[in-house]
Amino acid sequence: HEDDWTNEDVWVKAAPGLVGITESGKRFGIDKEGHPIPGYMTKIEDMRDKCRVAKQMPSAQNNFLTKRLNIWTQQENRWLDLALWDQNNIRPVTEETCMGRMSYGGIDLSSVSDLTIWVQLFPDNDDPDLIDILIRTWCPEARLYDTKNKYREQYQSWVKQGYMWTTEGDAIDEDVIRAHIIEDSGKFNIQRIGIDRGFQGYTFARKLDEELGGTEKDPMVAAVGMGWVSMMGPCQEIERLLLLRKLNHGGNPILRWMADNVSVKINPTGGGKSPNKATSQGKIDGIIGILLGLDGVLRNAGPVKVTDEYNAIAF
């Protein structure tokens, strides 16, 4: 029989230094007068807060089980809870609802024949913590009918529903993507666009930056690292906004699929996490696009929330 890890009464088995009164009334580490006994250091309030987050965030649950309760687990570090994700479907997001608003972009450019994602994050004018996500997803047309593509029926359905667009041929047409982003710059007040520092599309990024009026000192398109240090702030921010129910994705089914797929690498020293394509159970490009956009949002909020310097496109 395994104990219920959410039951406060059993926490003392793994945390003998627990101090406080459980929800059922059991007392640990306090004397008859209610004073803490010397040597009992783990406050039950802290455990309670971490347990609450663990219930809603799979990656936090794994961390809580292993580090707080000494429960060894083989589960992968799944990151986002789908029920919590669904609770962030707050209002419709369209070009019309975002027209003229300030945005922070993120591009996850495909290698050749995969998906390319262009995400824009729009902080609400009245509530900066409320962010609307506008996403555009492209796929090479040939991939819709490629029998080796196990997602082809999904893609075909999303194209019919207007959630996915295609470019002609077997490979993604970067000129189409760039032209669309330039067109968007006339509709929205784009502040910054983040792009994966490790990607191979230097020419794409350089041309886009030039066309958007970026400079070496003040780039419009900036390379962002995807490691623990660079992703610490964006990963924490996406979790915070989801828990506040303020990361409005408008019910986009592609983003929902990717949110369910994504897993993370957790720094064993406790210094953050980063998305892990290798262990994720499918495509996660849209989530990476959101993280790249959040990097720009955080930098606009001030240096305190930033963990890595922005880099002009200079590979």
In which residue ranges do the predicted regions lie?
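Metal-dependent DNA phosphodiester-chemistry modules and their immediately adjacent helices/loops
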Residues: 1-22, 154-157, 211-304
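Non-catalytic, compositionally simple segments
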Residues: 1-104, 113-115, 131-176
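Flexible, glycine/threonine-enriched loop-and-boundary segments that flank and lead into catalytic domains
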Residues: 76-107, 186-191, 195, 203-211, ...
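Acidic, metal-ligating active-site segments
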Residues: 112-126, 284-288, 292-293
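A short acidic (Asp/Glu
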Residues: 114-119, 201-210, 233-236
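Short, surface-exposed connector motifs at secondary-structure boundaries
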Residues: 184-192, 216-221
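Acidic, metal-coordinating catalytic cores used for nucleic-acid/nucleotide bond scission
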Residues: 194-203, 227-231
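Acidic, low-complexity intrinsically disordered tails
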Residues: 303-315
